[in-house]
Every structure is written in structure tokens, then in C-alpha cells.
Regions:
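Acidic, polar-rich low-complexity tracts and alpha-helical solenoid repeat scaffolds
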Residues: 1-147
Length: 147
């Protein structure tokens, strides 16, 4: 795969788009249980984060956050999602925000940082308009009440 990283396309933008597609395919393979796919998705994400294109950076952070969480690398997952929500908040749609904040909360829970998880869930609860998303966040907060 290193050979592919360097020789995908002569044009930088086309190369980054192709790398993003490959990273997303590894993400899909990881969801299907393919061995090593999550690691590859995270690796492609790391390559793409150096892009000068903010849209590619945003997609790379989404990709890397999910891959890291799947690998139980919750510190890396939180870091990716924090970068995403801090540097690219304006470009995120509601579904992307929900995914990022929800996964960040789950990773904080996995790290035993319950107060941080509660803070994340409370923050997103105020920013969502979709009733199903709001209910999912309310359920997460309720689940954490006893902790």
C-alpha cells in the first residue's frame, strides 16, 4: 500500500480524493470484520490529515476517529473528533456533528472519563434539532446518571 500512496495520481487533488476513497473502503471492510482494515483506514486518515484542503482534512478526521474507536484507541479517537469539531465545525452537517460528538462521548466513557462524556452529551443536546438524535443523547445522559 505504500507504493499506492505515492503513485496514485499525478494531480494532488485527485490523489487525495482517491486516497480518501481507499480509506473509506478500508473502513467499510473493518465494519465487515476484515482483518487489518481498521489499521489501514487509520493509516490512510493520517496521510490525508496533512492535506491543505479543509474538506479532505474534515473527511480524514471523521475516518480516523471512527477507525481509532473501532481499534479501542479511544485517546486517538477523541483527539481526531476534537480536532474535527474545533477546526471544521462550520463545515459539518448535523449528522456529522452528532456522529463526532456521540463517538467522542462513547470514547470518554470507555476511558472512564464520565464527567467529560456527560459534558459532551449535554453540549450536543443543545445543538441538535433532530428529535431522534436528541433522544439518543438523552438516553446516553440518562445511562450515565448513576455513574
Amino acid at each position: 500500500e505504500d507504493r499506492l500512496r505515492n503513485n496514485l495520481e499525478p494531480d494532488q487533488a485527485a490523489r487525495e480524493q482517491r486516497m480518501l476513497r481507499i480509506g473509506k473502503e478500508h473502513l467499510n471492510l473493518g465494519r465487515l470484520g476484515a482483518s487489518g482494515a481498521w489499521e489501514q483506514a487509520e493509516s490512510w486518515s493520517a496521510q490525508l490529515r496533512r492535506s491543505e484542503n479543509p474538506l479532505i482534512q474534515r473527511e480524514a478526521l471523521l475516518l480516523g476517529g471512527e477507525a481509532a474507536a473501532a481499534l479501542q484507541a479511544h485517546e486517538r479517537s477523541v483527539a481526531a473528533y476534537l480536532q474535527l469539531t474545533y477546526f471544521h465545525a462550520e463545515g459539518l452537517n448535523e449528522n456529522q456533528k452528532f456522529t463526532a460528538w456521540q463517538q467522542m462521548g462513547l470514547s470518554y466513557e470507555a476511558l472512564g472519563r464520565i464527567n467529560d462524556a456527560k459534558a459532551i452529551y449535554s453540549k450536543i443536546s443543545n445543538e441538535l434539532s433532530d428529535p431522534q438524535m436528541k433522544q439518543a443523547v438523552a438516553n446516553a445522559l440518562q445511562r450515565l446518571e448513576g455513574k
